[in-house]
Amino acid sequence: MLSEGYLSGLTYWNDIHWNCASYNEPVAGDQGKETSSVAALSYSSVDETQVQSLYVSCKSSGKFISSVHARASQHSRSQSRTVLQANSNPVFESPTLAAVGICRDVIRETYLVPPSCKSICKNYNDLHIAGGQVMAINSVMANFPSESSFEDGPLLKSSEISLSMEDSTSTQLTELPLKPIQRYSSYWRITSIKEKSSLQMQKPISNAVLNEYLEQKVVELYKQYIMDTVFHDSSPTQILASEFIMTNVDQISLQVSKEKNLDTSKVKDIVISHLLQLVSSEISTPSLHISQYSNITP
């Protein structure tokens, strides 16, 4: 009974010997001290000796188990710390791998485009869709839809981007005083007020917002042309009577008169006559050239 603690300690030692082999000598030293203390106990009564030996054996075995588990946990923590230090280098080092890592992010979705559409990322470097950044993708990546899937329609549409300025712009238009306006300038007068208020609310303007604005202006120009030709039986030259175009004519005339030292009225007549020569009976969509985002100053 006196060696019960020593025997129980050997049982636990055999079970976990593989996990703490580096700590054999310290554990053996502790074991020797505990068994020597147990062997030194002597009692006159057999019952007292059995009770005391059982208590000491349980106590010694508990100390042995706790010490072994503590050292095993320290050993595992040191191993995990070594693994973390070995893998401390970032995983995504190249731009392609960085794009893949961003694409896997659930919070911020990234829209990757095929190699044939890399000009979108170059010309529209600030383009966002629903808060996600548009990036280029390497052609060697697998599991990406083929380019034929983009042939049904445009890859990106400006109409899909909602503008928060529309509600505030409509409220500002209702507060404006009503004035008698001409027949041909009414349409462009309202739109010019709306565009001025919208352009002043967001600076600098991103390419996506500018694209949508230009698309709307082209559609409005088509509508104005159809209304003038069908309902009023007028020629396309009457579109020059609108306030939107005449304002630009005045600005051009003023600039030319300052540069050439000529009368403003004469320069205005020259500009209008030149525009009338360029007007044709057919209308076509102009070629739009949008500057880079870095060139726009707030």
Curated annotation (Swiss-Prot):
Disulfide bonds: none
Residues bearing PTM Phosphoserine: S291
Post-translational modification: The phosphorylated pLxIS motif constitutes an IRF5-binding motif, leading to recruitment of the transcription factor IRF5 to induce type-I interferons and other cytokines.
Gene Ontology biological-process entries: innate immune response; positive regulation of innate immune response; positive regulation of toll-like receptor 7 signaling pathway; positive regulation of toll-like receptor 8 signaling pathway; regulation of lysosomal lumen pH; regulation of toll-like receptor signaling pathway
InterPro entries: TASL
Subcellular localization, as worded in the UniProt entry: Lysosome membrane; Endosome membrane; Nucleus; Cytoplasm
Keywords of the record: Cytoplasm, Endosome, Immunity, Innate immunity, Lysosome, Membrane, Nucleus, Phosphoprotein
Motif (pLxIS motif): 287-291
Presence of keyword Ubl conjugation: no
Domains as described in the record: The pLxIS motif constitutes an IRF5-binding motif: following phosphorylation, the phosphorylated pLxIS motif of TASL recruits IRF5.
General function of this protein: Innate immune adapter that mediates the recruitment and activation of IRF5 downstream of endolysosomal toll-like receptors TLR7, TLR8 and TLR9. Following recruitment to endolysosome by SLC15A4 downstream of TLR7, TLR8 and TLR9, specifically recruits IRF5 transcription factor via its pLxIS motif, leading to IRF5 activation and subsequent expression of type I interferons. Plays a role in the regulation of endolysosomal pH in immune cells such as B-cells, dendritic cells and monocytes.
Self-association and partners: Interacts (via pLxIS motif) with IRF5; leading to IRF5 activation. Interacts with SLC15A4; leading to its recruitment to endolysosome.
Name by which UniProt lists this protein: TLR adapter interacting with SLC15A4 on the lysosome
Native source organism of the sequence: Mus musculus (Mouse)
